[in-house]
Amino acid sequence: MAIISLSYKYLERLTGTDRETILKRLPMIGSEVERLEEDHADVEFFPNRPDLFSVEGAARAMRGFLGIETGLPRYMVKPSGIRFTIDSKLAAIRPCLASAVIRNVSFDDESILSVMALQEALHWAVGRGRSKVAIGIHDLDTITPPFHYVASPRVRKFVPLDFTDELTLDGILEKHPKGRDYAKIVKDFPLFPLIVDNEDHVCSFPPIINGERTRVTTATKNILLDVTGTDQRAVNVAANIICTALAEAGATIESVEINGAPFPDLAPAVRTVSVRECSALIGVDLTAPQMAELLEKMRFGAEPAGPDQVRVQVPCYRADIMHDWDLFEDVAIAYGYENFAVEVPPTFSIGKEHPANRIAGQARAILAGLGYLEMMPFTLTNERVLCDRMQRPGEPATLRLMHPISEEYTVVRTDIVPLLLEMLQVNRHRELPQRLFATGDVIADLLTTQRLAFVSTHAGADFSEAYAHADAVLRELGVAYSAEVSDDAAFIEGRRADIIVGGKKAGVFGEIHPAVLTAFELEQPVAAFELDLRAVPGYPSP
């Protein structure tokens, strides 16, 4: 969840109404007011709505929701005449780029803070900590077009933001705070991505830091926006959100030609949806004109296209609209959840804890007592993490997504240990020892089962630790088991064992293989364990 600081003064200016009305209705569009201060409110927005991560975006949504200004916001984009080229050597490093020229900005301290907060929130929500998307905002009047996105030698020097002296690119990774934070994204490449102007001045070292030359201040009037990354759709989404937020503040947007194609594309997407399906889903009988009116409150363009159809124009910044039901959810929000009739269920029953949840809770308590910290890794992952890095063959039983929107999430997990190793990778610069565990569902052969897994990393982590902690967990859960030699290539030969319960394999434990550690960029040994919780006495049959 992203917590955004909304200035009352700026919010009132952009919405045209008072703060009391805004704060009362703001939670109804998908937010929670965390804290009220004298001059601002800290508001938590759901991560599926990154377009709300700024005062400008929140004000745009509230104007529609309050009926002040409804319908599709239209953003004019005219050509800037500025070109961008992309070095072909970046194809294997960071190949994707979007850009725009934003003119006539009027910055004060509040609006600069809003834009910078939006930038960082997008790095988190869309950019996966800058690895997938990174955003650069530059004072256009300090540099000379055309611009070039190049693969540069690591010895290239420039003055990074907030510094006064030149550093090499390697030096920035070592000495600049942002360099240390994000070095892991680029450090293994022989060349580094740079954005330079026509006079070879460095604008940006994405995804690390901008140059001091292009610093944005209250005197800045014209902006060059660059968005780089590894996923073009995500890059375009971030660019559209930044551009439209600044347009809401009164700026004008101009396109940049990137290898012959104009960016950004702020045209709406068009969908035609069923009124009958929407009414059945939300439980409210609507006509096509009524549904169109509700959608316009949520800042869509909408018009009836027949008695059972509405033609919807989806704003370019609404990256969360991927299915008709996403639109139906917005219809329900506009209708007002407080207006839905309350119905008492016709039958009465008494609930109790499901046995599977009871056993999982018991397992969590045991591992917490052993000093492990609970994680909640995603259910979706990819075969690089699940198979390649673990030295395991791809499994036909793996459930694959037909239309993944990202190469990071293409399959449903069949094991939990690989995802815990990925979490150790993210936290490898933190203090040791690190002991993590997770419980949750895995799917193989279309069968959903619940697993328990743990990993422990420190200089002394070994098979003995894995065995001791596995034995403690199994005994506390009342599992009668035996250990047999395992052939799992993810573990070191001779330091791995299968958990056998009732003559069947129910899990595995051991010391992770050095090749797997290298694949996850881990420098210390790792002890690991995974158990199918169906082996625990009292676990319910499917």
From Swiss-Prot:
It catalyses: tRNA(Phe) + L-phenylalanine + ATP = L-phenylalanyl-tRNA(Phe) + AMP + diphosphate + H(+). The gene is pheT. It is an enzyme of class 6 (ligase). Tetramer of two alpha and two beta subunits. It comes from Methanoregula boonei (strain DSM 21154 / JCM 14090 / 6A8). Transmembrane segments: none annotated. Its main location: cytoplasm. It is found in: Cytoplasm. The keyword Nucleotide-binding applies. One of its GO terms (molecular function) is RNA binding. Mg(2+) binds at D320, D326, E329, D330. This is Phenylalanine--tRNA ligase beta subunit. It holds the Pfam family B3_4. GO terms for cellular component: phenylalanine-tRNA ligase complex. PROSITE patterns: B5. Residues 266-342 form the B5 domain.
